[in-house]
Amino acid sequence: MAPAIQRQWLVARRPVGRPIEPADFELKECPVEEPSPGEVLVRTVYLSFDPAQKSWMENAAGYMAPVEIGGVMPGSGAGVVVRSGHPDFGPGDAVYGRLGWRDYATVPADALDKAPEGVPLDAVLSVLGGTGRTAYLALMKVGQPVAGDTLVISGAAGATGSLVGQIGKIAGCRVIGIAGGPEKCAWLTQELGFDAAIDYRHEKVRARLRDLAPAGVDIFFDNVGGEILNDALARLAARAPVVICGAISRYNFDPRSPQMPEGPRNYFNVVFTGATIQGFLMPQHERDYPEADARLAQWVRAGRITPRADVQRGFENAPATLMRLFEGRNVGKQLLQVEAD
């Protein structure tokens, strides 16, 4: 049974040109909406967090519908169907999709997917959905790895980067991850099977790339931007694809401000190497979602991909959980378990 009242987090301010703050959100209660025909009422078990959510709040993401002040904070989640107005879903079904920051969410059925059997809900959000689809499609369709390629990933200990590295290993690549701190680097090499890791906080990235990839970087998968991107551009192999998936080093700056970090200085090496730079947006690859979902679920069941979630607890902690991403505190996929216990 669903309660009569649901909790939801609303967007109260736009964090343009600065870090996210708790006052950017407002916690409110409202009546639970009964599902109309074509809708489903879901009890949220986990919420998923991604750096792109900051750009959604700023209305800087042109591929997303505008987020209004006073509107529910958008985001993905996983949960259990309570009541359904659609024949494809029934009470008790485990689902994931665009739930928003709500402990009970009434959403259109086409905003949901059923969780694969044998995959726990936290692993579903860690490996499937937007995170997994981004990792798989950006690497396989844009990066197009070939066995023997040297694949370098920035933000490698994050949700997307850690998956990209594991998929790269399955594809036969030599994988080098760039992450911040010895704990994250050890996790990449000792648990996920990366061939090497570079600690950008304590090592010079360009020098380490020269040592670890003397013939050059065959694929660079970028989640960070800034100086790390600049260093990678200097070490590209001939015709290397550079996949731009994120730029978390720049997200806290107003693009109109003089404080915005400079763009890469080594971009002209793209000319010398014949490399390509291509951005990735998941909605542009919608027709390939079934392929990504099937492959990822298969690899999880077979133990070829190791999910890891950084799980915080308590619905009231949603804003602080999002802020963890920008503080570099998460290892793996950042999730929030709605119930505290």
What are these regions (language model features)?
Residues 73-80, 90-155, 304:
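NAD(P)H dinucleotide-binding glycine-rich loop of Rossmann-like/cofactor-binding domains
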Residues 94, 150, 174, 240-241, ...:
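Short glycine-centered segments of the SAM/dcSAM-binding site in methyltransferase folds
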Residues 2-6, 304-311, 319-341:
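C-terminal capping/lid region of NAD(P)-dependent oxidoreductase domains
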